Swiss-Prot record:
GO cellular component terms given for this protein: cytoplasm; ribonucleoprotein complex; ribosome
PANTHER family per UniProt: 60S RIBOSOMAL PROTEIN L22, LARGE RIBOSOMAL SUBUNIT PROTEIN EL22
Domain of life of the native organism: Eukaryota
Swiss-Prot/TrEMBL keywords: Cytoplasm, Ribonucleoprotein, Ribosomal protein
Gene that encodes the chain: rpl22
Protein's UniProt keywords contain Nucleus: no
Organism of derivation: Xenopus laevis
UniProt-recorded name of the protein: Large ribosomal subunit protein eL22
Keyword Thylakoid: no
Pfam short name (any one): Ribosomal_L22e
GO molecular function, one term: structural constituent of ribosome
Cellular localisation: Cytoplasm
Length: 128
């Protein structure tokens, strides 16, 4: 008699995970050196879903902007590090990389901050 194969059915379904990351661009937008709408368009054009640029997976990834905060929501695996990479790329493209840096201020968000230049070091150099 031939061996009988058992059919295994998986009853557990994966829950849809909703990843939500925010980028806080408040300081540069208020100072007028950066445009939040332009940055939102940059992210829309550059985010890759399934290896394709610009399609955002047919609504799987969404980008929303409220004043100077940009929120990226995703139903598929999406890396926070990838968002940082794209932000740095945008800053470099617009020659802002020398003044701004991307800092994680919580587990789900980044903030654009100015580099802190020490006044004390400059004063010491002037005295010499």
């Amino acid at each position: 008699m031939a061996p009988v194969k058992k059919t295994v059915t998986k009853g557990s379904k994966k829950k849809k995970q909703l990843l939500k990351f925010t980028l806080d661009c408040t300081h540069p937008v208020e100072d007028g050196i950066m445009d939040a709408a332009n940055f939102e368009q940059f992210l829309h054009d550059r985010i890759k879903v399934n290896g394709k640029v610009g399609n955002l997976g047919g609504g799987v990834v969404s980008i929303e902007r409220s004043k100077s905060k940009i929120t990226v929501s995703s139903e598929v695996p999406f890396s926070k590090r990838y968002l940082k990479y794209l932000t740095k790329k945008y800053l470099k493209k617009n020659n802002l990389r020398d003044w701004l840096r991307v800092v994680a201020n919580s587990k789900e968000s980044y903030e654009l901050r100015y580099f802190q230049i020490n006044q004390d070091e400059e004063e010491e150099e002037d005295e010499d």
